[in-house]
């Protein structure tokens, strides 16, 4: 898996398609303790002259506490060929155990962007 940094202001991106149909991964935590979850909802826009992604996460989700205890989280977008991996990330909770090995087997590798884990 290779990473490609894209500038959303230059990308022809349909947020309804990318978020609602292709899904995204929300990832929070730090290098040693992180979790990722699939989301098919969210909002992209501009607030106070800053580009934003707004996500609503239930307090019962394992990722919620990691988002609350860290200043940032990442949003990763994928093509349809990663559907199996995203489906797994949306159905298996990090509360149940470390799901990161299975995530790797499915072709997703975590990387750090600054202090934030991302896929």
Locations of regions flagged by a protein language model:
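Active-site-proximal mixed secondary-structure blocks
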Residues: 1-119
